[in-house]
A protein has these predicted regions:
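Terminal, compositionally biased segments used for targeting/anchoring and flexible tails
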Residues: 1-110
Length: 110
């Protein structure tokens, strides 16, 4: 079986986890609320703009203030809190998976 097939199997296994199901459910709640969905998408755009490309320290600081303000406004919304919690749990699962892959590769280099 090829590497692409194994990667597909890994993705399917990740999608079969409780963490993914909870994240998907939390995202669906946000997606049903047009206004909230728009605010979350705007927050993601601001994050991407901050972390992509080369910008001056002053511009980065300005964007960070904007991002912090947007996050602060959303942080009081229960649906957003749930989305962030489930996203964090799923990211922990991904990090653990990547750590295990890395350890296996490192062991193979010895």
């Amino acid at each position: 079986m090829g590497l692409k097939n194994k990667a597909y199997e890994l993705a399917e296994a990740l999608k079969a986890t409780v963490e993914f199901a909870e994240l998907k459910q939390a995202k669906a709640v946000i997606d049903r609320n047009r206004s909230l969905k728009s605010e979350v998408e705007d927050l993601k755009r601001k994050q991407t703009a901050l972390y992509s490309g080369r910008i001056s320290a002053k511009e980065a600081e300005s964007r960070l203030v904007e991002l912090d303000k947007a996050f602060g406004q959303l942080s009081g919304v229960p649906e957003f809190k749930r989305y962030m919690e489930t996203s964090g749990k799923f990211n922990q699962l991904l990090n653990e998976t990547f750590r295990q892959i890395n350890e296996s590769i490192e062991a193979g280099l010895r």
